[in-house]
Structure formats: C-alpha cells, structure tokens
Amino acid sequence: MSSFIPLNFLEDTVSKKDLEEEHTRELQVEQAYKLFQSALKLQKQKQYESAYKVYEELFKLDIVSNHYFEELDFIRGLQDGSQNTDTDELTLLSPNVKSLRYLIFRNRGFLYLDMLKSNTENKSAEKVKEMFYPLLDDFCIALLYNEPDEKLLETLHEIFSYIGSERLSRFVLEYSLTSRKESDDLSGLLPIDQTVLSQYKTMLEHLSSGKFPKLDLKHLSFLEPIRLDIFAQQEKLASKKVAVIKSTSTKWVDLLDAINIHLKENQDESKIEDANRPRIRIFEPYVLTEEPLDIVRIEFTKRGVAVPATETEVTKAQPEQIVQERKPEEDNRVQRSSKRLSKVEDEIPAVTLESSHFLNMDYFRNQMNETIPNFEIFDVCSTYVEDGSGAQYIKDFKNIVSDWNDSYARAILSYDTAKSEDDNLKLLDLLSGYGKSEELKEKNIPPLGEIDIEFPELNYVEFKTYIIKHLLSKILTTKWSDKLYEKFTEWIVQFEGYIINDIDVESAIGVLEVLVDISTSLESQIKDSINNKLNKAVVNSMCQDLLRIKDKIIRWINYIETFPINDLQVASRFKWCQIIKEKAETKSWTENHPVKHKLQKLLGDAHFKINYPNYKNFIDFSKDSINSQLTIISVLAIFWRILSTSSTEDNKEAIRLLEDILLDSNTEPSDAILSIRNFLKQGSIDMKLSLWNILLSFYQSSNSGDKLTVGFEECVLFLNDYLVNEYVLLDEESRLVTLSRILGFYGSSISFVVTSLASTNWILMHPIKVQTLRLFFELSLLFEINEEASYISSLATSIKSKSTKSYHHLTNTLIKTIILILASIQKSNPQILHSVIRLFHTQLGLIGICGHAGGSFLEIAQEYLKSLPNSDQDICQIIKCKYHYSISIDGVVPADHGTARLDELNKNDCKELASFVLPLCFSKGGSTLNNVPKHDIKLLIDEIYDVIGDPDFDSNEALGRNKATLNYFLDNTRLTKRLFQEAFHGLVRLELGEAEEDKQFNGLYYIEGLLLFSSYKLRKKNMQSRAVELESAISLFENDIICGSNRFESWFLLGQSYGYLVEDDLIWTADKLTASDRKITTANLQRKSLICYLMAINKSLDESIKDVIKPVVGNLMSLFAKEMFSAVCEPMSMHAFKVQSHPRFINRVNGALFEPVSQFPAVDKTVCLKIIQQSLQLSIKSSCREWSDYYYLAKVQRKLDKPAGLVMETMASACRSAFKNKHADNIIEPHYNLVSFALKYVKSNRLDSKDALKYLIEDPLIKLEVGEETDFIKLIIKALNKIDSSDKKNWQHKAKYRLARLMQEEYHDVKGAIDQMSSFISLKTPNKALVSIWKPEPERPGKHFLYTFQYIHFYIELLKEIDDLDSLVAMLPKLRRSNSVMINLSIAWEILCSSVCKIIRESYGIGDNFEFTENLINTLPYQTFAANVKLLPDMMRRQSVPENLKSVLCFLFTVNDIKKLNNGYGPTSFIDDTLVTLYFMIYLNYFEKSSTEVTTDSPGLKKKIAKRDIFPLTNDILKAFKKDIEDVTKQKSYNELITAQKLKQGLNEDKSLENVPASANVNEIIVIDDDDDDNLSQEPATKKSKTESNS
C-alpha cells in the first residue's frame, strides 16, 4: 500500500465515525449469523428452551434489537401514502441486515409454533396466549423484511383459517398469488402456484354462497384456546355497550361535566398519543374512547357521591389564563427574586404604621409647601396611615397599592409606549365593541333552570345531538352561567361536524352564532397575546384554532343558505350574525363601508328585539342598537382617517379633528364632531383616554412642543375634574381598574412631554401651572410612602415585589412629574429653583430613585444648576449619581444614592462632565500649579481623556499646522542672547492658528498632563517614576498649546518635564557623559526645557493673568535658574547652547559638513551666569525664600567673582533657610559650602580668617566653638567633622573628601586621608561597587559621576604616595568595570596603570623614560637573543629561580594582567615598556655576558629586537612558573616585595613620611571645586618635578 499522503489531505472526522460504525455493524451482523445458526441447530434438535435463550442473546445485539421504531416509521409511511415525505430507515437497511432479520423473526415464529405443538396437555390457556400472539407478531414482522417463502404463507393461511379469521385467510391467499408479480426478485418469473390458485377459487365459490370453506386442520387443534378466546371477543363486540353517566345534580353544567369526565376516563391512551396534539382541542373526545357507547343513560345522584371534579381536556384559553401561564422571563425573574427574599420579608415585624415613621417625607412636604408658592400638598403621611381619610380616588389608590393584583398591572401598563405601533388601533376595538358591555344588554332575562326533560336511551352521537338542540333552543331566552356557556361552546367546536346535516335552520343559526362569538373572542386574545409578547408557540396555536373556526363558520353559512327562510326574525337573526362577524373582521373603515349599507337595509325590518344574553361579542338586535352601530361606524370612519395618517398633511388633518373633538377649538363644530362629542359623553373613559393619547402622540411626532404642552395641561385638567366628580359615581371594581388605567395613561402622556422637553434643552415652551400637577404628584408620593412602609412593616406590601414593570412605571411617573414641576418654576426666583432642586434630589436620593426614568431628573437638574450661583456641590452630587465619580468640594463628599452606573462614557457624557469639571479645576483660586486637582477629579479627568483621546491632526488642518509650528519652534530655536532679552520683556511670539475644537474640552489636555506630571513627581520621591509618564505629560502639554491655549502653565510644566527627562538621562548612568557627541540628545532636551521656561517667563508678563502668575513666579524663576545653572556648569558644560535637534549644514575652511554641535555657544557663559543671578534674585524677591535659591545664588556670585563677604553672606542665608526647613536633618550642602568657601577665601587671602570663622560660629548647624584654638585649618577640620556627624543618612561625602585633602596637604597624613576616603571607596571583593556614594536630593544631576572620578583619582595618588601596590592592583578589575558610574574613566584608568608601573620601576631604580629598554634593544644582537631565549626556560628550571628573580616574576605577572585588561582601551607604551623591562631583568640574569658581545650581521637576517617579540616570551615564562609565582604571592604581599626591593636599592623605607617632589611626568592631582569650576572633567595637566631626575 502506498504511503503517499497529499498535502491538501484533510481528515474527515464524520466520515471516520461513519466508517467505525459501519465496521461495528459488520461485526454484529457476523456475530448474529453465528448465533442464528446455533439457534437453528438447537431448534432442529428440538431443544426449544436452549434455542429460545439463544434468540434472546440475538435480540441483545443492536443490529437486531433496533427494529421496532424503524418498522413503526415504515408502517406510518404506508398509512400516510402520498403525504409521507420522510425517508424511513427501514428502506435504507443493507440487504444483509434485512435477510438476517427476516430469518430471525421467521424462525423464532416457528420456534413458538413448535413449542405450542409440543406438550400441549401441560399448557394453560394463558400460556398458549402468551406464545401465540408473539408467534403472529414475528411472522408478520418477517413480511416487512423479505418476500415470504411458501411454508410461511401456508402456515399463516392455516392459522387464520383455523381461528376463523376469514379476511386474513383470504388476504394470505391473495398475497401468495400477487407477490411474485409485484416482486423485483427472480421469483417473479416463476409461474403461479396452482395449488394456491385452486384454494383461492374454492374460497370465492363458498363466499358467493355466504359460507366459508371448511379445511381439515386437526393438526392445529392445540390452538383451540386461541380460537375460543377470539370468538368470545367477537361476541362481546357484537353486544351493545350501555354507558351509565352519573351527574351530581340536575344542573346543566354538572351534566355536561359528568359526560366530559366519563369520556375522559374511557379514552384510549394510545389513541391520544397517535393524535396530533394541537388538534386535541377540536377533537370529539368520543373518537378517542376504547369502546363505543351504544346506549347512554343518565342517573342523577346527590351531592357527596365521589365523582371526579370537572376537568376537560382543553378549555378555551382566557386572556387572564394566558397571561398567568405565559409570563415573560422578566416577571419570572421577579417572582424568583421575591421567593428568595420571602424570608427577609417574613422577618419584617408587623408594625402598626404611624406618621412618625415617615418623618423624611413629612419634612420634604413641608419644605415644598414653604418653598413653592400656592402648591399646598396635603398631608400625605397622615392620609396614608389613617383609614378612610381623603377623597375617593385617594382611598381607592390606597386600596390598589395595598392589594395589588395582575388586573391593576395590566391596566396601568396598557398605555406603555414601549408596546407595538398597533396599540392606537385599540381605540377602534373599543368603538367597534361599544354596546357589548353588560350595562347595555337586557337585564330581565330569566336564568336557565335545572334539567326538566327526560333523556331517551340513544347512542352517544344521538344523545349529544339531542342535548345540543335543546340548549340551542334556550340560548336566546335564558341567561347561562359563564361556566356552562364555556363548556357548551367547547361541545359545539368538537361536535359540529356530526350535526351539520341533521339539524333545523334555527338551531343551525344558533351553532353559527356560537362559532362567530368564539372566533371574535379568539381574535381579540391573539391581539392581546401579540401585544403582551407571549410565547410564540401559544400565539401560533391560537392562530391555527382561529383558522379552523373560520373554516367551520364558512361551512355553516353555506349550509344555512341552502334553507329557504320565511320567518323574518330568523332571517334577521342570520343577517345580524353575519354583520357582527364582518364588523369584527374589518380592519379599515370608510364612510361607505359595506357593513353600513347592510345595517341601513336591516333597519327597515327591525320592528322587534332579539336578546343575546350569553354571547360575549353580540349586541342585542333592535332599532336602537342598529342606529347606535351606524353612529359608531360613522365615528370609526373619522377615527380611521386619524389613525391611518401617513403623511404630514394627513397628520395635520388628524390633529385638527382631534382638537375639535377634545379641545373645543372650533367655535362652529360640524354635525359629525357634535355627534362624536355626544357619543364620547355616553362612552367610557377609555375612549377619551385613547383619543387624548393619540392627540398627544401626534403632537410629539410632529415636534409641536408648545401644542403638546398645552394639550397635556388640558388633558390633566380633564383628569383632575373627572377624578373629583364622575369617577365617584362608578362602582368599586370599575373605579379601581379605571384609576389604574388613568395612572397608566398619565405616565405615558407625561413621557411625551418630558421627551419633548429634553429636545428643547429643558425649556418649557408653554408654562404649566404647578397646581395642575399637584393631584398626580400627591398620588405618586402616596405610592412612594407605601414602598417605604414595606420596609418598615410587613402589613404593607411593595408593588416592586409583585410587578416590577408597574413599579418602574409609577416611579418614572413621579420623577417625570417632578421634572415638569421644575420646568414650570424654572423662570421663577433662582433661589426657589435651587432650593426645590436640592429638595427633590435629596428626597429621591433617600429612596434611591434619582437615576430612574433614564436619568431625566439628573439631566434637567444639571442643566438648571449650570446657571445658578453656588451650585457646585449640587452638581457634584449629580455627577456622583449619574456617573459615579465622587468629587468633594470644601470637604463635602457627595452621598451615594445607589444609582446604576453607566457602562461607559460617550463623547456627549464627556462634554457635560467637562463643562463643569474643567472650570472647577481652574476655579479654586490661584494657579492650578499650587492647587492640583485631587484624586477624585483625577479619575474623572482620566476617563474623559480616554474617551476624547488626542487631537485629530490628520483631519483638522489648523491643528496640523499648529503642531508643525510648535515642533519647528522647539526643534530649531537656539538659545541666543536675543531670545533671552525678548522673553524677559514679553516680546516672543509663537504664531499659532485658532483651532476649531469643542470649547467644553478647553484645558482637558492641560489638566490631564498636570495630573500625570504630579503623579510622576510623587512616584519620583518613592523612586518609582517612569520616563514614559513624562513623555505622555509632555505630549499633553504640547496638545494644549497646539489647541491654541498658549497657556502659561503648559509652558512652565513643559520646561519642568523636559528638565526631568534631562535628570533621568544624567542620574542613572554616566554613558551619556563620556563623550561630547553622546551629550547631544540630553543637551537638546535641556535646550527645550530652557526654551519652555523662557516662553513661560514671556507669558508671565501678560497682565490679564497677573493673579495666576503671582503665586508661582518665584518658583518659575527658581526652576529656570537651576536648570540653566545645570546647563552652564559641569557635566553639561554649555552644551545646550551649542546644539539643536537637526544638524546644521556649515561651510568650514576644510569643507562643508553637517554640524550637530556648534564649536562655540550662542551665549557667553558670563551672560548666562548673570541671567541666572537675576532670576534667582527675582525668585527670592517674590517671597519664595527657598534655601536652594540662596545656595545657587552664592555659587553664581562666586563664579562672577563677587566680593567674598557678599558670597559668604548669601551662603549663610542659605544655611539659615535650610535649617528652618522641615527636612533640615537631610540638608547639609549649604553648611558644607559655607566651610568650603571660608577655607578657599582665607587661603586665597580674600577673606580674613576671623571673618570666616564668624560665619561658622553663627551657622545654626555647625555652631563652631573656637575656644583657644588658633589654627584655622584645625578649626575647619572641626567644622567639617561636625557637618559629617550631622549626616544621619550617610549620604554626604564631600566633607569626608575635604578632610582627607586637608590631612594630605596640610599634615601629610596619607594614611589618615586613606582612612577617610575608604569610608566610601571599597577595594574588597564582596563589594561590587568601587565607590559607594549617593546623589542627595539637592545635588545637580550627573554631578556625582564627576565626584566619583575625582575621588578615585585622589585615592590612587594617595596609594601611590605610600607605594600601596596591593591596593592599586586590587583596584584594577573594579575600576575597569566602572564605566557607568563615572566620567573620564580612561583618564583614571591610565593614571592607575601608570601608578602601578611606576612603583615597580622605581623599586628597581628605573625611571619613567624608556632608556633602559631602548639601549638594550639597540645593543643586543637579535640572533644571539633569539638563540638564548630558547634556552632560557630550561635554564631557569634546571638552575631554579634565584630569590632576586622571584619578585620580578610576580611583578611580571601583574603587569601582564594589566596589559590584558588594558587591551584596546588605554595607552599601552608605558605598560609595554615595563613588561619588557621586567623580562630583560630575567634574561640578563642568565645571559648578561652575551648581551655585550658584538656580532657581524648577515645580509637578509633580522637585525633588531622589537618589543612585540617579547610578549609571547613573557607568556611562556609565566605559564612555566605559574606555581612558583603563586607560592611567592601566598608568602609575601606586593607591598613587602616592593619594600624588600627598595632596601636593596638603598632607598628610604618610610617613603610616606618624606616630602619627595613628584618625578617627571607624574600626573597632577585633579581637584573638583565645590562651586562647579569649568575644568573639572578635562584631562589632567602635568607639570615637571622640581627635583632632578635620576638617570
């Protein structure tokens, strides 16, 4: 088999599964055949029980046991015939499986037959039955799978003949004769079996004579029990079945119940399963019974006899039942939550409610009455708790809320605007149904009496027909109970098909009336179900029922029309029924509707009256009712014109008609309008409410806000009047439902007004009197009191727990009423408006609903409060409720009112918030720099910025130009003297265009940047800051400027932000300070920082923002001066004055080139220092007396060579100011500089020592005690020690360094100086850092890298001075790795390497020049040297290394390591010469004589030794004598070896105590001045020693 698999091959998991199933099926077929063969073998051996067990095993296999449902589908398919569209699985079975099943069923049948034949004497009749019927089943099932063989057919023919089943016997013969012709097998080619044909002919001859042929079937005598059983069953079926139905009373309803129950008890369950379930409703129950009811007898029993309660299979669904059965999911959730909370509710005590329980509401009512003139709300608290108090509608409303039910919920939600657009058509339903109500029907109709007739013994169909005819004769003359009528209509629907051809015309009309009544009710239920959004399956089922009923109606109309009707009343009754049917089905009405003509035609014959006391949808027939219907049709035609409007013009016409009807706007109304008005006076309140609802909705859809307001006010006035007057006349039940509908209508109508009000920015177009709204406002307050009471006492029940939708409707009604009250008083006294808003919000917040109704109350309150003074706290409360951001003002924190949070803000929300929050950020007095918004506002600003995002520079050309202008200005502006002059005189102009941005967001980018910048500074104190935060802040400040603000604060903070970026570049690593070109990026940042500071200074001269500038100008000048000082001095060294972002193309003498850095700064350093001095003086003058300002001013004054006294006085001021600082313990710098300046001025003779000491004595930290000490240096050391001991955090290092310098320079105490420096310089291996110094907060960024270089340089010189070679060698690897912690590492490295080499050379008396090696190389013949060096290692091993060479080997090892560390880094000549010198010392020890021999050079040979030839030789020696070197270094240190060697040379042992001038080429010690001299990081200068050098 090929192993090739295509690349595009995809494994089909479904096919794979099918293959697996097929494989399993094949295995089962194989297993089944084996078992079948085994069973067949046992069957032949007459081991019947064993064979039966094998068959049982066979039927456990899936391939066999799954036969039932396949066969059932196959049989049903045959029964359905052409209507069958499903493919049954039986036809898809493989031939193997079909053959297998055929054999199994056939042979198991014969097994049963054999078992019956054997031992028949011991088998009971029941046992025979148990085996015979499975036998027949198996034979019959076998016929489904294959064509039967002759034996099977013959056996079936004999069995059927024996048991007397003539039809089945004949069927078998006919099947035998026709099966071959119909078969597709080869057997179809065989001729007909003559024996079977002969038997069939004989049977036909006997049947023609009325007799069935007798066959000799004695061999089947064992089936005699079966034959007898079948005969008994047939006799039983032939006898008549008498059904005795017992009724509990002689009432018709109980009789119908009894008949229904009897039928249900005798129904066949299998028939019910087979029947189509949805059709059971219209099924006659008798069809589903097991046995026929040939005779029906009725027996009346007394009450108490155990008769099952009436329960029909399917009752007609009533609207209330449907609502209860099919509630929406939301209502179900409410019920579930109510169940969960039932325990909590049970725990609420049954407290008797009193007015004192509602003090908040009472306070609110009193305040409202005091605040709003003439509002006068009644005492709602007392009214609620006192029974029987208040007007009728008040009492009824209390009853409604205390005993809430579904009918109130349906009524109050009937005008819910969320329903479908077809709701307006309810008005047509109301009008078209006018007259159906009970009050318009005849009252004096006698009730249907008890059963007064005898029932003949009839079969079921005749019996039921008899009852229906009798009841139809009384349906118009007697009044029935609803239950009886309901059961009777059910009978008519189920049974009408049996009586349609056996009934008189009058009864037929009665059946038609019942069907029309059912159809009309069902159509109304379907409409309600659709509007109530019930389950689609329920609606579909009702629609199917309606279609069936309509089919029945058509059939009955056709049937009745076949009768000649001569009786006028009967004919009128038939026509009236048809008119009612057509009217109910009419969807559109016109003036010339066919129904109208039919009514007019019928009017002439209406000289009598027909009552319809039982039909729900029939109006009594009379001349008055016909006239009423004609009027209603005329009204419907007009209303149809109103409701069917589609265009604006039609809409106007509809509005005009409604205004004429409802508002009496036409002084001369037409007759039609007058008739409608009269009609409405007689009609129910529902019609008027529907008309008002339509008018108001038209106003809203046509955006007629003023008309909507007027119409609403007129409508509310009408409702107020109605509730006080006409409402009282209604009965109690009608009142409660009517009041609920009025509240629902009011809530819907006020929603129209509030929606319109929102579209006009909450300005009411037409004023509404507040008193008009009082009645419904009071009802709403009663509702809220009831809700509050439900939390206090279990005697009160919350509507929310029973109907969430109703609760929200009433809550929203309260809020919208409040909105209209606010809109009505909006133009009154602002103080009243403010007080009312606060009252409403407090009260609504207490009950947690201020955010309901879509937040409309919060919207209108926010809009009105914008223009009211002193409303910030109220607006903050609205923001808390609306957006859940808590903003506190003056310590007042908004309360949590439990409102729902918005999912996320959108741009419109942000506009609203920004219009309040951004001005609030700028309104807190002074500059925002000193009043940074708090955390609560920060969260909100962040959210707004996230939604708004950065400006869209691509789509907004003005913004794009502004951005390019700003970037060009920052990138290309150089720090020139002219720029400084113009900035300090306010003359710099940056021309930015006016951007078209939303004014609401003016300042957003600045505030967001300010918050980000403040966060960075806070994190910076905790060492958690990130540069990315600064970059984001810079972008935001630039966006603020780009949008045209030219804001002083943005420039100021931009300067600080860029300054912090400079600090971030300089503070962590010295990488950007090691070379001039590496400083360019940092210098550009510093240049931008200074430019932004200058722009802020330029803007600070604007008189319009003088109040904002004044508090921060000192800080501005201080920060600018410090940033500029940092730019002028080391380590930046005026670099910011030389660079710009883009290199300039310069034409030099040596050619044109791009120059990133100018050779000379654009401003002289002295000018810069004077600007810094002036800025610091301005800062100090502005009362910003920061110690660092004095500190930097003193440094600048010293650099400008100001008098020593002035400098010292300024620094003393810095010391005094620092000592008063709350962090005085950490501020050491000014005190140290005071000592340092005193020392330098005294040594330079610019200040008398007494004057200098005076400053130190008066310093609050040093407090120098002079005593009798006269040595100025010792007093300075004492002051320095005092400063050092004051450093609690051990951050300061300059005092220690100065002490070390004084010890070395003044007292030649080198070891003491080394001890001082060792406090922060560590040569120990565990300490990875060579120098451990920290940057104190006041120290300029990058300065500590200069100090590190200075200290290392000084430390090396100290170690060299005492020949401490061990320490110097230990310093080598650490210093080599110190590139990131210091500047000028190469210089320090060169000094260290040269110092090690010098100490070694000096110990052997070799100077710093290269005379020794040069002389030797020039005199030593190369051939001799080459020959000797090959012998040198062996000679050293053979003769052993002498003592005088062991130290040379150790030094050679050290210098070789230095050479490796120095490779590719520093100068090498001095190190190489030292290495060669040491090697030649070893060489000369063995070949001293040969080195002076003179040889003749041969042509072509190398003549001179090169130093590089020596390096491999040194490596060879070091490798060969590595162990010897290790032994020596373990026994002696390098210092001991140096000391021993110098003793040999006759030098003084204690060199450290002798004042020896520096030898030639010794590097001068670099001193970094504490006031930032300019030559700090330059390469050290050298000077010649005054002593003579040794040759």
UniProtKB/Swiss-Prot annotation:
Main location: nucleus
Residue ranges with Basic and acidic residues bias: 323-334, 1581-1591
GO cellular component, one term: nucleus
Record keywords, A-Z: Chromosome partition, Nucleus, Transcription, Transcription regulation
Segments for region (Disordered): 316-340, 1569-1591
InterPro entries documented for this protein: Hir3/CABIN1 (IPR033053)
UniProt GO BP: chromatin organization; chromosome segregation; filamentous growth; hyphal growth; positive regulation of filamentous growth
Keyword Nucleus recorded: yes
Places the protein is found: Nucleus
Family listed: Belongs to the HIR3 family.
Function: Has a role in a nucleosome assembly pathway that is required for the integrity of heterochromatin and proper chromosome segregation.
PANTHER family: CALCINEURIN-BINDING PROTEIN CABIN 1-RELATED, CALCINEURIN-BINDING PROTEIN CABIN-1
Protein name per Swiss-Prot or TrEMBL: Histone transcription regulator 3 homolog
